[in-house]
């Protein structure tokens, strides 16, 4: 029997996606990454067909003995690389992790302080997302546009006046660390909790190029496991022994998650092991690359945000492209050349301009994992110039992009072969392999 046409089309689309995004494009979306072949090999397993409601060894289903083992191992590994005491991997995304934390910390009608939306706050922090769905009132903290950060003095005054149930730091446009240690004492002084959304920078935290929020006074930290931490899509919650974590952990199931997509667990564990051995070098190269790309773009005439601060300390670069037609137009133009970025609000944009903002948000973490370094950032900046400023033929630039990718198809910062696995032999690795 021949394949049904519908099935053929499904296979064609999947193959086309794999060829396009894995071999022909410069993937510069700040919220994406790529797993290693090793992590992908354990992602596709029987775990994806199974259920395991509840916590390890306290399940509501039978047949979970290996689920309990891999979940416990994965949490232990994540705590080890994070230097934390508590980890819960059941949230299926960073937004679900935020929802669980927010729901425990506040009731409908309560107040929470966040960074301004146009200055990088994630939609889940706002009335348009999770906070709004939970009936929690969000109030934006004062923002220092020059320093691209929360205004510490004004924020302290607001905390003292508003007395919120919690304060959220972290964001989705996130160039420089928010003032955790500066605000934490004042948050706690009014009886509030400090929540740090590290979805974008978790890989930089465990890679030790970004300060640990938990060590600077955050009560709880939420993360995504697929941005600068290059694992499977999912979320996690960490703490350093806080009572808040215990409360949140008790409510993840059944309030926000039933089954928690068990095939994520072995892939997360493998990625944690990779980051244990390669995470610091990976994170360091990410930050070198982002700075190199920012400088190269600025040298070619682009208005890169944060010049007075060195442009960036994260994996991200933000560029104002209003003079070329705005973020929406330019993001689409770059996609035509196989350069994948996203349009983004900049700190001086109005929230209602979200569909056509001033800026582009660029992330270097995925192409760094494919082995690109500072010299390639120069090449990428030149490709941007050819498309946006020089207005070169898009198809010609697209060919250059495809040729460039031919040399960067192999995932780095992982174990290359079984000899590497033997070299770094450990009890944890033997359990996975």
UniProtKB/Swiss-Prot annotation:
The keyword Amino-acid biosynthesis applies. GO terms for biological process: glycine biosynthetic process from serine; tetrahydrofolate interconversion. It is an enzyme of class 2 (transferase). SUPFAM superfamilies: PLP-dependent transferases. The record marks 226 as: Plays an important role in substrate specificity. Coiled coil: none annotated. Its EC number is 2.1.2.-. Pathway: Amino-acid biosynthesis; glycine biosynthesis; glycine from L-serine: step 1/1. GO terms for molecular function: glycine hydroxymethyltransferase activity; pyridoxal phosphate binding. Catalyzes the reversible interconversion of serine and glycine with a modified folate serving as the one-carbon carrier. Also exhibits a pteridine-independent aldolase activity toward beta-hydroxyamino acids, producing glycine and aldehydes, via a retro-aldol mechanism. Belongs to the SHMT family. This is Serine hydroxymethyltransferase. It comes from Saccharolobus islandicus (strain L.S.2.15 / Lassen #1). The gene is glyA.
């Amino acid at each position: 029997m021949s394949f049904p046409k519908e099935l053929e089309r499904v296979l064609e689309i999947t193959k086309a996606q794999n060829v396009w995004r894995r071999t022909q494009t410069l993937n510069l979306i700040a919220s994406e990454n790529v797993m290693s072949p090793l992590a992908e090999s354990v992602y596709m397993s029987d775990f994806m067909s199974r259920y395991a409601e509840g916590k390890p060894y306290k399940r509501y289903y039978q047949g979970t003995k290996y689920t309990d083992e891999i979940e416990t191992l994965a949490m232990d590994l994540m705590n080890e690389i994070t230097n934390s005491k508590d980890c819960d991997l059941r949230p299926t995304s960073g937004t679900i992790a935020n929802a669980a934390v927010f729901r425990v910390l506040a009731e409908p009608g309560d107040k929470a302080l966040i960074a301004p939306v146009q200055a990088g706050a994630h939609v889940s922090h706002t009335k348009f997302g999770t906070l709004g769905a939970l009936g929690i009132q969000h109030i934006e903290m004062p923002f220092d546009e020059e320093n691209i950060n929360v205004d510490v003095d004004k924020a302290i005054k607001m905390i003292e006046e508003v007395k919120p149930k919690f304060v959220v730091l972290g964001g989705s446009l996130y160039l420089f660390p928010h003032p955790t240690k500066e605000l934490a004492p004042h948050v706690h002084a009014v009886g509030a909790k400090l929540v740090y959304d590290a979805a974008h920078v978790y890989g930089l935290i465990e890679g030790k190029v970004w300060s640990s929020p938990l060590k600077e006074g955050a009560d709880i930290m939420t993360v995504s496991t697929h941005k600068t931490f290059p694992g499977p899509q999912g979320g996690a919650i960490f703490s350093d022994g806080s009572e808040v974590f215990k409360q949140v952990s008790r409510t993840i199931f059944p309030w926000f998650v039933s089954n928690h997509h068990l095939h994520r667990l072995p892939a997360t564990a493998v990625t944690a092991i990779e980051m244990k051995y390669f995470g610091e070098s990976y994170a360091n190269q990410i930050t070198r690359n982002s700075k190199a790309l920012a400088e190269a773009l600025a040298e070619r005439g682009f208005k890169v945000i944060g010049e007075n601060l060195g442009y960036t300390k994260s994996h991200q670069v933000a560029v104002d492209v209003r003079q070329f037609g705005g973020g929406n137009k330019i993001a689409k133009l770059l996609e035509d050349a196989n350069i994948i970025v996203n349009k983004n609000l900049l700190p001086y944009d109005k929230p209602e301009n979200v569909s056509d903002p001033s800026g582009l948000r660029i992330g270097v973490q995925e192409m760094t994992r494919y082995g690109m370094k500072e010299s390639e950032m120069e090449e990428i900046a030149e490709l941007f110039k050819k498309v946006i400023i020089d207005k070169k033929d898009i198809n010609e630039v697209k060919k250059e992009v495809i040729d460039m990718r031919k040399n960067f198809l192999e995932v780095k910062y992982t174990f290359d072969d079984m000899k590497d696995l033997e070299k770094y032999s450990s009890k944890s690795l033997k359990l996975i392999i």
